[in-house]
Amino acid sequence: VAVHGSAPGFDALADDLDGAVRLADAAHRHPGAATTLAQLLRASEGQSTEAGLLLESTAYATLQAGPEHAAWLADRGRRVRPEEAQPPVLVADEGDRFHLTLNRPRLHNMLSAAMRNALVESLRGLAAGDDRPILLDGAGRSFCAGGDPAEFGNVADPATAHLVRTSANAAPWMDRLAERLTVRVHGAAVGAGVELAAFAARVEATPDATFRLPEV
């Protein structure tokens, strides 16, 4: 960790000394996650999207098997979401374009397994169809406030979780459709919300849009 401009060979560059201290403190508190992140960023530089996603999932599975993740799960307790009546992704053919809307507005469109699967199914269908533009946005007050913490740790083991991530993932389909895709961000874009937007060739952000990666 270093202040920006002082040491280009470092893994993390902060804007000022206070930022560098905060980064160093976070790395000290979570050394496994910090080290794995640095290794992942080094290894994935210059890789294809597919290779980068595979490396990321493998790194995440490693952390899921470690003590830091176990302590986090024990500390947060278990959450249960009520069954949702509305589809997690809305799909509309608007003639000149396709319009996909993340549809969990009460939860700021936190990405659940059901939403992920619906998004993958929609994107797969659009990839097989014509080449009209695609707009992706979110219902309610936010675009996407990240993965749903109620589902974190629900998969039986890290190996199974890795297989799920690498077989049911919207990212490869968004990468394939990137030139057709516009993501419209309003309100919060956190974690997975930032990642979804990053795969689009065009991102439109409203004045109230905020972007945050809690892992960094």
Where are these regions (language model features)?
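Conserved CoA-thioester-binding segment of acyl-CoA-metabolizing enzymes
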Residues: A71-A139
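Glycine-rich beta-to-alpha active-site loop
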Residues: V1-L17, A170-V216
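C-terminal alpha-helix plus adjacent terminal tail
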Residues: V1-F98
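Short, active-site-adjacent cap segments at secondary-structure transitions
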Residues: A38-Q39, R141-A145, V190
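Charged catalytic carboxylate motif
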Residues: T36, A114, A118, T166, ...
